[in-house]
Amino acid sequence: MTTQQTVKVQLVRSPIGTKESHRATVRGLGLRKLNSISELQDTPAVRGMINKISYLVKVL
C-alpha cells in the first residue's frame, strides 16, 4: 500500500456573501463550519480547489 501525500485545510473566513461556486467548492473540500479542518489527498484537483478559494482557507 502506498502512502498518499495529504494536505490539511482550515476554513478561516465565512463563505457568506461569496459566489455560489465558491460556496460549493468549500463544501466539496468537506468544510462546514468556521475553523473546521479537513485532511485531503494532495492532488492537482484538490490544489486547484484550494487555489480558487484561497481567500477563505488556510493550509496547515
Curated annotation (Swiss-Prot):
One GO BP annotation of this record: translation
InterPro entries assigned: Ribo_uL30_ferredoxin-like_sf, Ribosomal_uL30_bac-type, Ribosomal_uL30_ferredoxin-like
In terms of Pfam families, this protein maps to: Ribosomal_L30 (PF00327)
Keyword Ribosomal protein listed? The answer is yes
GO MF term set = structural constituent of ribosome
Indicate the family of this protein.
Belongs to the universal ribosomal protein uL30 family.
Name recorded for this polypeptide? Large ribosomal subunit protein uL30
- Specify the taxonomic lineage: Bacteria, Pseudomonadati, Pseudomonadota, Betaproteobacteria, Burkholderiales
